[in-house]
Regions:
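Helix-loop boundary and gating motifs at the non-cytosolic
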Residues: 10-59, 210-211, 219-233, 243
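Residue-level signature of mid-helix packing/kink "hotspots" within the transmembrane helices
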Residues: 59-67, 151-152, 251-259
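Helix-to-loop junctions at the C-terminal end of transmembrane segments
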Residues: 65-77, 162, 258-269
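Helix-breaking motifs and short loop linkers at transmembrane-helix boundaries and internal kinks
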Residues: 77, 98-103, 269, 291-293
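Structural signature of the two symmetry-related core transmembrane helices
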Residues: 80-94, 272-287
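Paired small-residue
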Residues: 103-111, 296-302
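Cytoplasmic helix-loop-helix junction between adjacent transmembrane helices
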Residues: 110-145
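C-terminal membrane-cytosol helix-exit motif in multi-pass small-molecule transporters
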Residues: 173-192
Length: 303
């Protein structure tokens, strides 16, 4: 078994397994946190605009600190960056029930966004620094798939914990703690990073505007969907539990389609596939909204 895994992932297979496990746990945590906060704010009577502005706090921090996180990672190393970021988020998750105003939540989510960007950049850098041309594609595919699986499980965790009281925040904090246990207890190599000058952000955007734009839109679509879809369902007289189940159906569709899309990318024009995906993403929510009384159409549209 070990030989087969090593043959598939390469000599750094132990490190990859640890990072995949951490990505799974963090995916579960984020898949729980994002809809949790939106549902709590909606239950308190905040408008969609106020909820949306609150949601934006985390990605806003990622954008503003895009040049800062690589400096920190080079200073203290990859493993320490992930551990410190997760410890910060553990503390911050417990502040949500204490400071429950909209402004305080914006500040908390902004700081969590910075910590999340630090951890995620460290994960990506670690993963790609070990990969080479022989295994980079499969490593990135597994990494993304594992994270999406975790993200898909998040709404189910929320289904079990509910949105009331401290319990959901305790569970999310426990998941953050679980993510750092393998990094602390297992002997894995923290690779030495080369001293390379990073490209200016503007130059990167100019070099690949389509990819950059697609990444921004996909990230925005994912966050807004998980944040607002449960609210939309509840306002259309669906139970909270049912709303979360439809979110999971959508995310499971993303997991199942990952390898299919990977095969299609090798056989068809990439830009055509991307444009097709955009059209499907645009049409399916419209179809969904017209068939709220038909489970099969709703499920297929979400998937």
């Amino acid at each position: 078994m070990t030989t087969a895994v090593q043959s598939f992932l390469g000599n750094n297979y132990k490190t990859y397994i640890v990072l995949f496990l951490c990505a799974l746990i963090i995916g579960i945590k984020l898949g729980t946190l994002v809809p949790l906060l939106s549902l709590i704010l909606e239950s308190r009577g905040y408008s969609n605009t106020e909820i949306g502005l609150n949601v934006v706090a985390q990605p806003l921090a990622v954008i503003l600190f895009v040049r800062v996180t690589p400096i920190i990672i080079h200073k203290i190393g990859l493993a320490k960056s992930i551990i410190i970021a997760q410890i910060f988020t553990i503390i911050l998750y417990f502040t949500f029930p204490i400071f429950d105003t909209l402004t305080s939540w914006f500040i908390i989510r902004f700081i969590i966004g910075f910590a999340g960007a630090l951890a995620w950049n460290a994960f990506d850098t670690w993963m790609l620094s070990m990969a080479d041309d022989t295994n980079r594609g499969k490593i990135v595919t597994i990494y993304n798939t594992v994270f999406v699986i975790g993200f898909a499980l998040g709404p189910m965790v929320l289904y079990m914990t509910g949105i009331e009281g401290w319990l959901p925040f305790v569970v999310i904090s426990a998941l953050s703690f679980a993510a750092i246990i393998p990094l602390v207890t297992m002997e894995i190599d923290d690779p030495k990073l080369p001293d390379k000058k990073t490209l200016p952000v503007l130059a990167t955007i100019i070099a690949a505007p389509t990819i950059f734009g697609a990444a921004i839109l996909c990230g925005l679509d994912d966050v807004m969907f998980v944040s607002f879809f449960p609210i939309f369902m509840i306002k259309n007289q669906f139970a909270q539990e049912i709303a979360l189940q439809y979110v999971t159906i959508t995310l499971v569709g993303g997991v199942i389609c990952q390898p299919i899309i990977g095969v299609m990318l090798d056989k068809f024009n990439k830009r055509t596939l991307m444009n097709s995906a955009v059209i499907i993403t645009f049409i399916c929510p419209i179809i969904f909204s017209f068939y709220l009384d038909n489970f099969y159409v709703m499920a297929v549209s979400c998937f």
